[in-house]
Amino acid sequence: MSLALLVGVSGSVFAQKKGFDYKFYGQVRTDLFYNTRSNSETVDGLFYMYPLDENLDPNGHDLNGVGNGNFYTLYTRLGVDVTGPMLGKAKTSAKVEVDFRGSGTTYSLFRIRHVYFNLDWGKSALLVGQTWHPLYGDVAPEILNLNMGAPYQPFSRAPQIRYRFTSNNFMLTAAAIWQSQYLSVGPKTNKPGETSTQKSQEFMKKSCVPEFYLGVDYKRPGLIAGAGLHVSSITPRTQSETEDAVYFVNERVTGISGEAHVKYTKENWLVSAKTVLGTNLTQTSTVGGYGITSIDEVTGKQQYSPLRTSS
């Protein structure tokens, strides 16, 4: 069980200079939470995902049956939307938004949420920068909790190059996506059979292949319906440290995921649904990972099988 208290204050300021329009916005947010037991979580318990299983000591007491709570203002945020001059036939715009989340276990520091520019030619648009991961999409739970439905709903903001084409009521989205704050999980060391894990950018960097997303949406007033396909490929290790030597290894874990969504709104109510078949989507705050299926007896090179989940 968790309890959240939200106090928001938002506003906007307009300015204009040499063909640019600026709209400043922000909010003051406070979060008071209490959890009845230990959980899988981030941000010191503020970003709740799911309760941890029982872990009994010799006396039968649950080590995870301990409550916790705190009060934070980390998600107070500031932002600016910029509308720029025409660039050829394209309308230009940009966004910068930050909060005080920090990174890892270092809190109360500026953190980038959204930073991108967008070129809009009418039917087609190109976005370059960091914004919501395409798997987050236009259909997500509307709740006070910061996790927005994770680990069932993918949650991530990621650097990307995204192209959208709109014709009549249909919109095609194609994106190449990298990782920055929300990362893949991999082995903590290069020893064969290592099961301790860590989150790191190295697994995607060494892969040299971004994530790819392709989706289609049907939109009309009050209705959104669509589906998307996502592919990711990471490199867990490039070296294997055996007892005798250090070997170069070429390892890769590739996963294909899919999602479908629908949202209908009318006057003061809405109905929405979304399903995700995910393969190793730890970088989107969902349940994921992969297991070792075989280990080479000489080099320690490992084969893997990704974890698939459905929500």
Predicted features along the sequence, with ranges:
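Intrinsic-disorder/low-complexity loop/linker signature
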Residues: L56, N169, G193, T299-G300
